[in-house]
């Protein structure tokens, strides 16, 4: 059976749900797909299909980043259901790096929790510029309490530069919408309308040389190695030569798909699978970058502006000094690096500082690129590359 080709009829955006564990992100994602399937513009993806890995189903939490797709009247969305479990926030960093906007899910019953704040901070650091709030479980909450939670959330958004007063806050119930309750089905439609109108079409860097950070690597028996990820910039077609940075090899793209549909050309913003000719499965891994040959040079040393999280934001309680060796999350790569704070020598929690970083291995870098700094399973800093040195 031949597959139906992907036809680009509407602008494409990448959107994600984020928020604290058990506030209902995955249920809400399932509800969105159900409401749209009933409108005829998508396929219903049940809750247990979004939480894909068996270990997650057992624990009831989302670890890997799960993608679903759907369409509203005006747009085509790839929707990322992001992990809410603290150990796995690093996965969120790489997922958030490709988002055009986000739906922050906050339980109307519990209000802001530690991860709610951490996710908002991370979203800001990795360049998510627009957040729409879904106050979930609103069917079960007391209205006055829900009003207070809304004020809290607006304050949190304002604290991180998201203009909390103007951000849409929609009261929803993912569970009731899944059960088909008309009032709460309408709330999901209102949420999607808010996303359609509040999250602008981003500028896509279609004219720049092709670049795709590798998220996952798979093997298709008899056909070869497939890499998946979101195209950061440029375009790619079947037959194009590409370079895999990190693996040190050049190859040709022999197949191109999005959500299981073949496509002629992928462009910035698309979530794609690339079939690569003659590349051994173990030669490529998450964190590598597929790019137009010669368009990027991997480097290991750079200067950066870094914000060191305060203890209140879940960061360190003690200062960072030169010689500190945390993990740097850059695109989909996770690399240890040495920090040099120069004459200042010390960076206290809550401060923004300049530093020189020497990574343990070379990765494609350029000024303006955002990254997160983590140690012991928590985010301790977030920064931007200022120059290659």
Swiss-Prot record:
Binding site for Mg(2+): 26
Function: GTP hydrolase that promotes the GTP-dependent binding of aminoacyl-tRNA to the A-site of ribosomes during protein biosynthesis.
Protein name per Swiss-Prot or TrEMBL: Elongation factor Tu-3
An example molecular function term from Gene Ontology annotations: translation elongation factor activity
Subunit structure: Monomer.
EC class: hydrolase
A single GO cellular-component term on record: cytosol
Region described as G1: 19-26
Start and end residues of each stretch annotated as G5: 173-175
Cross-referenced PROSITE patterns: G_TR_1, G_TR_2
EC number of the protein: 3.6.5.3
SUPFAM superfamilies reported in the protein's UniProt record: EF-Tu/eEF-1alpha/eIF2-gamma C-terminal domain, P-loop containing nucleoside triphosphate hydrolases, Translation proteins
């Amino acid at each position: 059976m031949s597959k139906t080709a992907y036809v680009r009829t509407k602008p494409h955006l990448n959107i994600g749900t984020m928020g604290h564990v058990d506030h209902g992100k995955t249920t809400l994602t399932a509800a969105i797909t159900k409401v749209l399937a009933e409108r005829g513009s998508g396929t219903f993806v049940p809750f247990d299909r979004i939480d894909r890995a068996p270990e997650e189903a057992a624990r009831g939490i989302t670890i890997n980043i799960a993608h679903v797709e759907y369409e509203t009247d005006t747009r085509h969305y790839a929707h990322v259901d992001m992990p809410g479990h603290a150990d796995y926030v690093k996965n969120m960093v790489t997922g958030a790096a490709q988002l055009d906007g986000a739906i922050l899910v906050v339980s109307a019953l519990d209000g802001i929790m530690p991860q709610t704040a951490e996710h908002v901070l991370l979203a800001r650091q990795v360049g998510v510029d627009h957040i729409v709030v879904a106050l979930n479980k609103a069917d079960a909450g007391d209205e006055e309490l829900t009003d207070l939670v809304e004020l809290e959330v607006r304050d949190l958004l304002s604290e991180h530069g998201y203009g909390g007063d103007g951000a849409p806050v929609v009261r929803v119930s993912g569970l009731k919408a899944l059960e088909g309750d008309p009032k709460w089905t309408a709330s999901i439609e209102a949420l999607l309308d808010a996303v359609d109108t509040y999250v602008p079409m981003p500028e896509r860097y279609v004219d720049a040389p092709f670049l795709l950070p590798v998220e996952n690597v798979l093997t298709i028996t008899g056909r070869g190695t497939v890499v998946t990820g979101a195209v950061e910039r440029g375009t790619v077609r079947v037959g194009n030569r590409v370079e895999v940075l990190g693996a040190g090899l050049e190859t040709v793209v022999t197949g191109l798909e999005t959500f299981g549909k073949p496509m002629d050309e992928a462009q910035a913003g698309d979530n794609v699978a690339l079939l690569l000719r003659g590349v051994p499965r173990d030669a490529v891994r998450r964190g590598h970058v597929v790019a137009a040959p010669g368009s990027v040079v991997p480097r290991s040393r750079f200067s950066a502006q870094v914000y060191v999280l305060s203890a209140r934001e879940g960061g360190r309680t003690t200062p960072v000094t030169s010689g500190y060796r945390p993990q740097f999350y850059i695109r989909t790569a996770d690399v240890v690096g040495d920090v040099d704070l120069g004459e200042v020598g010390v960076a206290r929690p809550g401060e923004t500082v300049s530093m020189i970083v020497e990574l343990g291995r070379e990765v494609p870098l350029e000024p303006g690129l955002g990254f997160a700094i983590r140690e012991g399973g928590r985010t301790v800093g977030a920064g931007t590359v200022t120059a290659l040195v």
